[in-house]
Regions:
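Aromatic- and glycine-rich peptidoglycan recognition patches
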Residues: 16, 33, 38-84
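Catalytic cysteine-centered active-site loop
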Residues: 1-23
Length: 84
């Protein structure tokens, strides 16, 4: 089953590169302490820009782009949780 905690979710599945990202992959961010995974999103669009959905504490569930400075600066890694 899928782990409940974000840091454990980051160990679930296979780590992939930016060039391999597909719809359904997970993207992880360090939104607090540098390098410490604390937030996850689900990729919903891969081209021309990566778009992901996630739950924001202040704004609820929302869509954002990986190209936004806030997320680009906090990107840690991508995971493919399930094999295609």
């Amino acid at each position: 089953s899928i782990p409940r905690v974000t840091v454990d979710q980051a160990k679930f599945g296979e780590e992939i590169s930016l060039n391999e990202v597909q719809i359904g992959d997970w993207v992880f961010f360090a939104t607090g302490q540098v390098g410490l995974i604390s937030h996850v999103g689900l990729i919903i669009k891969e081209k021309p820009d990566i778009v992901f959905i996630h739950a924001s504490t202040k704004n609820g569930v929302r869509e954002d782009r990986l190209s936004q400075k806030y997320y680009k600066d906090r990107l840690v890694k991508f995971i493919r949780p399930f094999k295609n």
